[in-house]
Amino acid sequence: ERFWNLWIDDMVNRQVEAVVYMFDDRAFKGGNDALQQIAGFKFLVDAILNRQYRYRNWKARRKGKKYMPKLIMLVANKADRFFDDTAALLWQQDRIGEHKIFDPFRDDLIRLQRGGVPTRRSFMATRIGWNVENTMVDLLTA
């Protein structure tokens, strides 16, 4: 939480084209971990849509006023914990955005889409190496 401003500053200063926001199943279970994950994404969305960045100098201010990432990818990590028959069916039909794991972020995803920022969603399980490369390639080729 205390580093969120620094992430936004770095993202704007480097003019990052693609943003990956990774979360895990704790966002769906509730508690303080869920609050941190959901609030972090909301902070990111608010900063992008409202262009509320801290500016260190005039050049950064000029760059920041025009900045908008080309893509935001929301990635649900630890898929080995929540991947069930419903997830498999949605995966086959290329409709993973409808999975319940993305429900806590749905309102902010809609806000991004209304603001003209393309979004993608994906699953991965980094611990076992499932779908990690495919997700990153998908992000880079979007």
PLM region spans:
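Structural alpha-helical scaffold elements that stabilize or flank donor/cofactor-binding regions
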Residues: 11-12
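Conserved GTP-binding G-domain of TRAFAC-class P-loop NTPases and closely related GTPase folds
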Residues: 15-142
